[in-house]
A protein has these predicted regions:
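Short glycine-/acidic-enriched loop or helix-start segments at secondary-structure transitions
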Residues: 5-8, 54
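Active-site lining segments that contact anionic ligands and/or coordinate catalytic metals
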Residues: 7, 39, 111
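Catalytic cores of eukaryotic secretory-pathway lumenal/extracellular enzymes that build
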Residues: 8-14, 43-47
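Alpha-helical scaffolding within the catalytic cores
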Residues: 25-31
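Short glycine/proline-enriched loop/turn "hinge" motifs that connect secondary-structure elements
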Residues: 32-38
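N-terminal low-complexity, intrinsically disordered segments
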Residues: 14-21
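C-terminal, flexible cofactor-proximal segment of oxidoreductases
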Residues: 30, 43-156
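Short, small-residue-biased leader/transition segments that mark boundaries at the very start
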Residues: 1-2
Length: 156
């Protein structure tokens, strides 16, 4: 389960001084479930927007850790000091997550699951997991790397 509340309890501040809680006031927003716009060099594992909660969690954790490890290696090898998802990439990923889930039981109007944030009164109701499957998710992550970490800003 996404522990959005756990991340929000830690006073992690982004480059503009906003906390994650402030950044996510309208719901969690990530690129691939791995990074948050405005929080360079901060990686999340099994975050909202990833398929982790709908798969064997260990498989997803392993893929996330491998991807992050390879990414950090790439940053070091290329003397890149910061990586951050572009806001448009986050928007596009969230749109894709919702398009893939559209019409599924997960997004049915009668669904009151934590997948939609229904477990916490007042929490924004947005769909969080990627239902496209672990294989497709891995392919997308690999394509992003092959395209030079498309959707990310790399700063030297």
């Amino acid at each position: 389960m996404y522990k959005r509340q756990a991340l929000e309890r830690i006073d992690i501040r982004g480059k503009d001084g906003k906390s994650i809680k402030e950044e996510w006031h309208a719901g969690p927003r990530t690129y691939l479930g791995l990074q948050i716009h405005g929080f360079p060099n901060m990686f999340t594992i099994t975050g909202p927007g990833s398929p982790s909660v709908l798969s064997n969690m260990m498989v997803s954790i392993e893929q996330h850790v491998d991807w992050i490890t390879d990414c950090i290696g790439h940053l070091e090898d290329n003397q890149v000091r910061a990586i951050e998802p572009e806001e448009k990439a986050v928007d596009d990923w969230i749109l894709h997550v919702n398009e893939v889930a559209k019409g599924s039981m997960f997004t049915a109007p009668s669904c009151n699951s934590w997948y939609l944030g229904a477990n916490i009164p007042g929490k924004p109701r947005i769909f969080m997991p990627y239902v496209g499957g672990v294989g497709e998710y891995r392919n997308r992550c690999d394509e992003i790397v092959a395209a030079g970490y498309s959707g990310f800003t790399l700063s030297k």
